[in-house]
Design a protein with these regions (language model features):
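Bacterial N-terminal signal peptides that target proteins for export
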Residues: 1-7
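Bacterial N-terminal signal peptides
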Residues: 7-16
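Compositional signal for N-terminal targeting/processing segments
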Residues: 20-341
């Protein structure tokens, strides 16, 4: 419950943002005329991107054209909880958090912008914004951490891209639905240099169903947005047949500058994605570290981090320890000991 003020603050920031220009929302919605799925690849924890996503989700011109909002930040094994929650059911905070915490991404989804998507879909349905109920589809691998004790146990769930593509196949495409798919930018790229390591979610969907997916990534650099003639934020451009189609995809990466030369074999924007979105920079939002003061949760995070380290070499154990320490420091400042008389 300690994190609630931070989540509320995040929602106030989202609500106070400048409304999205009508053409950006309308132009993205128009892609549903010819595609079943619009995928937006976000930069994790980006306040600007999620401000735009919230505005788009609450705009009937877009959200009422989709049947589903599918998200990377949710465990597909817990789909029944998502269905209950977004239909107005009463779930405990533990049940709600389990949907995004019970994944193989140990920390990122604690950022309030992700929970906000869950709450927005619930609110859309409660207010009957659309003639039909919008379903929240949890797209990530059906991992059960209670049955994972070693790296070998985790390996079957390592290919998250295929897992998300399979979920989209089962829950959206096979049902002839239209959907918004929200993932990290990595998963939205249709052409990469590392296909030997496995296909991205967008690549798999595109190969199974050519033309079904319209993928979008954001341009975080204001300098790149200016060079690409994006116009004031938020602004959107489709790649095919436009002035950005044959421009280096490197311009969509954080930190791009006008003096940066393109890589010798860099792909073009039109080769990698179908459109780009500029939302006015990229500032990150983080949850209160006090959420890690729950000793049971912190212990379980350390256990999961050790298993992930054994499988991938990525080490989150020290990060968890640092977050717990930071949480204690904040707690001490917020609750100083009484001054003796």
């Amino acid at each position: 419950m300690r994190a609630a003020p931070f989540a509320a603050a995040a929602m106030l920031l989202l609500a106070a943002a400048v409304p999205a220009r009508a053409d950006a929302v309308a132009d993205i919605a128009r892609q549903l005329d010819t595609h079943s799925v619009v995928q937006i690849g976000e930069l994790h924890r980006s306040l600007q991107i999620h401000t735009f996503l919230q505005q788009m989700l609450r705009d009937p011109r877009f959200v009422c054209r989709v049947d589903d909002v599918a998200v990377e930040f949710g465990n597909s094994r817990l789909q029944k909880l998502a269905d209950a929650y977004t239909s107005g059911g009463a779930l405990s905070e533990t049940q709600i958090a389990s949907m995004y915490r019970e994944t193989s991404v140990p920390l990122t989804w604690n950022t309030p912008v992700y929970r906000a998507v869950y709450d927005t879909v619930r609110d859309i349905n409660a207010k009957h914004l659309c003639p039909h109920r919008v379903r929240l589809v949890l797209a990530d691998a059906p991992l059960d951490w209670s049955k994972v004790g070693t790296a070998k146990d985790l390996e079957p769930f390592a290919d998250r891209d295929t897992a998300m593509a399979d979920t989209m196949e089962r829950e959206v495409i096979a049902r002839h639905h239209h959907a918004l798919l929200i993932t990290g930018e990595f998963h939205a790229e249709k052409k990469t240099n590392d296909e030997a390591d496995g296909l991205r979610t967008a690549q798999t969907i595109e190969r199974r169903h050519p033309g079904a997916l319209f993928s979008i990534v954001t341009v975080p650099s204001p300098a790149a947005a200016e060079a690409l003639h994006m116009g004031p934020a938020p602004s959107f451009k489709a790649a095919r047949g436009s002035d950005i189609e044959h421009v280096s995809f490197a311009m969509t990466k954080p930190g791009w500058t006008a003096s940066q030369p393109p890589a010798p074999k860099s792909f073009t924007i039109g080769e990698v994605v179908d459109g780009i979105l500029y939302v006015g920079g990229d500032s990150s939002l983080f949850p209160s570290p006090q959420i890690y003061l729950d000793p049971v949760y912190a212990k379980e995070l350390r256990r999961r981090a050790a298993i992930i380290r054994a499988m991938t070499g990525q080490d989150f154990v020290a990060v968890v320890d640092d977050l717990v320490k930071e949480g204690r420091d904040q707690d001490a400042l917020a609750n100083p000991p009484p001054v003796p008389h």
